[in-house]
Curated annotation (Swiss-Prot):
Belongs to the halobacterial S-layer protein family. Residues 205-216 have a biased composition (Low complexity). Residues 137-157, 383-402 have a biased composition (Polar residues). Keywords: Cell membrane, Cell wall, Cell wall biogenesis/degradation, Glycoprotein, Membrane, Plasmid, S-layer, Secreted, Signal, Transmembrane, Transmembrane helix. This is Cell surface glycoprotein. It comes from the Archaea. It holds the Pfam family PGF-CTERM.
Length: 875
């Protein structure tokens, strides 16, 4: 029984296996048929490939040289791939994944590249690519791209298209799917059936309509009965290729509203900032006019500036001005402006024409030419009808032209501007608030005549600023390096370096040339041109200055100053050197004069420049033309007026020549030359000159030895000190130790000493083979010498005498016994020399035992000593 049951089970299982194999064969053939590559016009919502219907190459077979795509399934071997007839066994040729099998179906992430039957380049195989829908565009009836934007509903049948490019035409068709904003598929309702077939295939399907244009494929849309809202359009492969880049989704807003809208980026801007705006909800390719009335213009602007209120950027195609005759050039407006008129008095509007491109029209407004108030921007409708008389097609400015409204056959000032006859599509307002300008420098204190940096910050849109100073009344212009204005850089900062505020021909320069406390400010050039002549005004009232975009700060102006010193050595300059150094500070000056006068009336002078930090320094000034003796040295400054005394001379070099060849050119004594210098500078009438006076001796070079550390041990250090009037660095003092035969034992030197002329040299004898004895120390500066003697003793001998110097303490500790016995010391000198020991012993005993009972013992000893002394006296 068991045997029979097992046999029945075996037969049953065998039958199942046969049926399953048959079913698999049927399923495979069905799938292959369903996966024909690019097969046909069976897809009512998509095109066929370029091979055309019924072409055998468009079925699922793939032969050598074919292009296949990631994600394709059920490919058939349609050619000879060498010994391997299974396409899935093709091997990758090169790269990191060389040798891997292609697979069938092909994985969606299979590495792209060449695959051949043996994995070698040049043999039979296929090329694997990534399937891509490269572009999807929704277009209106005017072929304008409204992808992601607005598509107006049609009133006369199909008038919109979806067009696409893709790269897998050889594999399968594209399919379009449209969903409304609720996710409901409405493809059949909006897509015209069988549209967008490539031109070569149109004759194969009489139901095809529409055009693919410059794209690979196209579908025609009929929006006549479509609800308003946002629609999502997906274009992808019809079967296998619906993933990744093979699927592309876009959106479009379908609306029946014919009224455009205007959106501003901000509802408040600082005067000078650019304000961006967008014209939306209008068909692609339309033109709209935007206007700002002339009453919004800023006072003082030029006609050219007014014509640029709407910037010619983005989608703006045209900008300009409108008067009662229509569009008018800026030059004509400028000629029409009277002496007491503003540009706003002879114009109606500033306008811009904006094209709808890519779903919207983008423009920008230059707010620096608008008043700081609330500004209205008006948007007018667009039309394709030439009879409407406003912007359309190439006639961009037609909405601001004049229409013959009085019927006299002439467009003139008696007629109306077209925009006056139209209702606006939209209007928006924004507030222009006054900006700020900050003056960072100068501020605080300023020394008249000195160089200073002028810098600060300004709001966006301020191109130039002007600097003004105020004493008690109006603001007066400050000229800066010959210019009345300072440019503002792209980062909204302005800067001028090394400016002398007191130099210039304007009233502000004159104000800051005198000491005092003032206001200094900076203002937008636009607000400083009150008469609109294109240049800033020399004078502004406080009200005019404060009402503009401006900023001010306090400035304290101080007078020029002078201080300095000459470098001498021990109050002298050696005639052997014939040079002297000077340094100091002269804030507010570019140059000073240094002058020298000797007792015989000779003079030497030269100009010394002052650095940006107000300091000056000059080395090696030549004074060899002066006679030895007392010399006076002077530093001269021409003061804040830049003129020496009342001479009318402002040239430093000219005054130097006057000193050397005028005052010192005759038989004048030194005092007379000095009197002339003073009389024509600091002592002159109403002079503001400054002077620094010093005195030194010009004499022969001299170097002396003042002290040596003698005696010195043979292994010790000899310290030599002295004075000199020579200039360090340029001279060297050499110290040499000479033996009794004037032979050199060792040499040291120095070239460093201070203005007191004191020099010092240490001579190390530890490494010198020198015997105890007397030697000569010589100091030599190259021109002058001085000598002194020194004693060298045995090494360590000075240290042996050290105990003698260490015994002062015992002497100071026993003063009382010495003072109590003066008479015995003088009368009996011999016993005195014998008695110190008992005294010191008694002292020690006293300090060592100071308890009760010792006092009586000491007294007894004292009595015995007194008795003995009396006996000795009797003898």
């Amino acid at each position: 029984m068991t045997n029979t049951k097992q046999k029945i089970n075996a037969v049953f299982l065998s039958a199942l296996m046969v049926m399953s194999v048959f079913a698999a064969a049927v399923a495979f053939s069905g799938a292959a048929a369903a996966a024909n590559r690019g097969a046909g016009f069976t897809y009512s919502t998509g095109p066929t490939d370029s091979n055309g219907g019924g072409n055998g190459d468009s079925v699922g077979q793939v032969g050598p040289g074919a292009v296949v795509f990631q994600g394709e399934e059920d490919l058939e071997d349609g050619g000879n791939f060498g010994s391997n007839t299974d396409i899935g066994q093709l091997q990758k040729v090169s790269g990191d994944n060389s040798g891997i099998l292609l697979g069938n179906p092909i994985p969606q992430d299979q590495p792209t590249g060449s695959y051949t039957f043996d994995g070698n380049s040049g043999t039979d195989g296929v090329t694997l690519q990534t399937p891509r829908v490269t572009s999807v565009e929704v277009q209106n009836g005017g072929s304008g791209d409204v992808t992601g934007s607005t598509l107006q509903t049609s009133s006369s049948g199909p008038d919109a298209f979806v067009r696409a490019d893709y790269n897998f035409q050889e594999a399968e068709d594209l399919e379009i799917t449209v969903e409304d904003e609720n996710g409901l598929e409405v493809t059949n309702e909006i897509v015209v059936q069988k549209t967008g077939l490539p031109t070569a295939d149109r004759n194969n399907d009489n139901g095809a309509s529409g055009s693919n244009g410059d794209f690979d494929v196209g579908w025609e849309l009929d929006t006549t009965d479509i609800d308003e809202g946002q629609y999502t359009i997906t274009v992808e492969g019809t079967e296998d290729l619906t993933f990744g880049d093979a699927s592309e989704t876009v959106t479009v807003n379908i609306t029946s509203d014919q009224q455009a809208s205007l959106n501003l980026d901000n509802d408040e801007v600082v005067q000078g900032e650019n304000l961006q705006f967008n014209v939306e909800n209008s068909p692609e390719g339309n033109y709209h006019v935007v206007l700002v009335e002339s009453s919004e213009f800023r006072d003082g602007i030029t006609a050219d500036q007014a014509s640029r209120i709407f910037r010619n950027v983005g989608d703006v195609q045209e900008v300009g001005l409108v008067d009662n005759t229509g569009p008018v050039s800026a030059s004509t407006v400028a000629s029409n402006v009277g002496s007491d008129q503003e540009v706003a008095d002879v114009t109606r509007y500033a306008y811009g024409v904006v094209e709808i491109d890519g779903g919207s029209g983008v423009g920008s407004i230059e707010t620096q030419f608008l008043d700081d108030s609330s500004v209205d921007v008006e948007l007018y409708p667009a039309s394709d009808s030439s009879n409407d008389g406003y912007a359309s097609g190439g006639s961009h400015a037609s909405s601001v032209t004049v229409r013959d409204t009085d019927g006299d056959g002439t467009d003139d000032s008696e007629d109306a501007i077209v925009t006056d006859l139209l209702e606006t599509d939209d209007d928006q307002s924004f507030d222009v608030v006054e900006g700020e300008i900050t003056l960072d420098s100068p501020s605080g204190a300023y020394i008249t005549g000195s160089q200073i940096d002028v810098n600060g910050t300004a709001n966006q849109g301020v191109d130039q600023v002007a600097l003004y100073a105020r004493d008690n009344n109006d603001y007066e212009l400050i000229e800066i390096d010959g210019s009345n204005t300072v440019s503002v850089d792209g980062d909204d900062t302005f800067s001028e370096e090394d400016v002398v505020l007191s130099q210039g021909s304007k009233g502000g320069n004159s104000i800051v040339s005198l000491p005092g406390s003032y206001r200094i400010g900076v203002i937008d050039v636009q607000d400083a041109d009150l008469d609109s002549d294109g240049t800033v005004d020399d004078t502004l009232t406080t009200s005019d200055f404060n009402s503009g975009v401006s900023g001010a700060t306090a400035l304290r102006v101080t007078d020029t100053a002078l201080n300095g010193t000459f470098t001498t050595y021990n109050g002298q300059i050696a005639s052997d050197d014939g040079q002297i150094d000077v340094d100091g500070q002269a804030p507010g000056k570019d140059n000073v004069i240094v002058a020298f006068v000797d007792s015989r009336g000779n003079a030497a002078a030269q100009v010394v420049s002052v650095d940006d930090d107000d300091s000056f320094s000059e080395e090696d000034i030549d004074i060899t033309s002066l006679s030895e003796g007392t010399v006076t040295a002077h530093i001269l400054s021409s003061g804040r007026d830049g003129e020496y005394g009342d001479t009318g001379t402002s040239s430093d070099s000219a005054f130097v020549n006057t000193i050397e060849t005028g005052y010192a050119g005759g038989s004048s004594t030194g005092d007379q030359v000095r009197e002339q210098i003073l009389a024509n500078t600091v002592d002159d009438t109403a002079s503001d000159d400054l002077i620094v006076n010093e005195q030194f001796r010009l004499t022969d070079g001299l170097t002396t030895i003042e002290s040596v550390s003698s005696p010195v041990e043979a292994n010790g250090t000899l310290e030599v000190q002295g004075n000199t009037n020579r200039v360090p660095d340029d001279n060297t003092i050499t110290v040499e130790i000479l033996n009794s035969e004037d032979e050199s034992v060792t040499v040291e030197s120095t070239d460093e000493w201070g203005s007191d002329g004191q020099w010092s040299v240490n001579v190390d004898l530890s490494d010198v083979d020198i015997e105890p004895g007397n030697y000569t120390v010589e100091a030599d500066d190259g021109d002058n010498t001085d000598r002194t003697s020194v004693t060298v003793v045995e090494a360590g001998s000075l240290e042996e005498e050290q105990p003698d110097t260490e015994t002062p303490e015992p002497d100071t500790e026993t003063p009382e016994p010495d003072t109590e016995t003066p008479e015995p010391d003088t009368e009996t000198p011999e016993p005195d020399t014998e008695t110190p020991e008992p005294d010191t012993e008694t002292e020690e005993a006293t300090t060592e035992a100071s308890g009760p009972g010792f006092t009586a013992a000491i007294a007894l000893i004292a009595l015995v000593a007194a008795a003995l002394l009396a006996v000795r006296r009797d003898n």
